[in-house]
Amino acid sequence: MKVILKEDVHGLGRAGQTINVKDGYARNYLLPRGLALIADEKNLKVLEYQKKKFEEQAKKKRQDAESIAERLSALELTIKAKAGEDQKLFGSITAKDIAELLQKEGFLVDKKQINISEPIKRVGEHEVEVKLLSNLSAKLKINVVAE
């Protein structure tokens, strides 16, 4: 029997795939638990429609992320922090601080999206990576000045 998986099923396939399984397995396990649908014409059309809709949403999301990446790359944040004589900061600037500054600038960025190897502890220019999608990131310039 051909079925369309609604969820990922270990050993069978991923959600959205059309697979062949034994009739009993489909009737007694997959269908009652809501893991699959019978692959009839109606359900296949619905699946195609959902795939197209998902692809359009992914494309729009990618375009939005690319425009945000472009704006972030052009942006240079200036952060004022207290520093000692040797240009060392009292405290440090973390991903959370950068995320808050970006939110004040109008960017909805979570601190988990900011890739910073270690907190910034010195005055000067620094470059931070902001991960927007799994394969798209932007370089953000941060200028730390002493108060």
From Swiss-Prot:
<dbReference type="GO" id="GO:0003735">
    <property type="term" value="F:structural constituent of ribosome"/>
</dbReference>
<dbReference type="InterPro" id="IPR009027">
    <property type="entry name" value="Ribosomal_bL9/RNase_H1_N"/>
</dbReference>
<keyword id="KW-0699">rRNA-binding</keyword>
<dbReference type="InterPro" id="IPR020069">
    <property type="entry name" value="Ribosomal_bL9_C"/>
</dbReference>
<dbReference type="GO" id="GO:0019843">
    <property type="term" value="F:rRNA binding"/>
</dbReference>
<dbReference type="Pfam" id="PF01281">
    <property type="entry name" value="Ribosomal_L9_N"/>
</dbReference>
<dbReference type="GO" id="GO:0022625">
    <property type="term" value="C:cytosolic large ribosomal subunit"/>
</dbReference>
<dbReference type="GO" id="GO:0006412">
    <property type="term" value="P:translation"/>
</dbReference>
<keyword id="KW-0694">RNA-binding</keyword>
<protein>
    <recommendedName>
        <fullName>Large ribosomal subunit protein bL9</fullName>
    </recommendedName>
</protein>
<keyword id="KW-0689">Ribosomal protein</keyword>
<comment type="function">
    <text>Binds to the 23S rRNA.</text>
</comment>
<dbReference type="InterPro" id="IPR020594">
    <property type="entry name" value="Ribosomal_bL9_bac/chp"/>
</dbReference>
<dbReference type="InterPro" id="IPR036935">
    <property type="entry name" value="Ribosomal_bL9_N_sf"/>
</dbReference>
<keyword id="KW-0687">Ribonucleoprotein</keyword>
<dbReference type="InterPro" id="IPR000244">
    <property type="entry name" value="Ribosomal_bL9"/>
</dbReference>
<comment type="similarity">
    <text>Belongs to the bacterial ribosomal protein bL9 family.</text>
</comment>
<dbReference type="Pfam" id="PF03948">
    <property type="entry name" value="Ribosomal_L9_C"/>
</dbReference>
<dbReference type="InterPro" id="IPR036791">
    <property type="entry name" value="Ribosomal_bL9_C_sf"/>
</dbReference>
<dbReference type="InterPro" id="IPR020070">
    <property type="entry name" value="Ribosomal_bL9_N"/>
</dbReference>
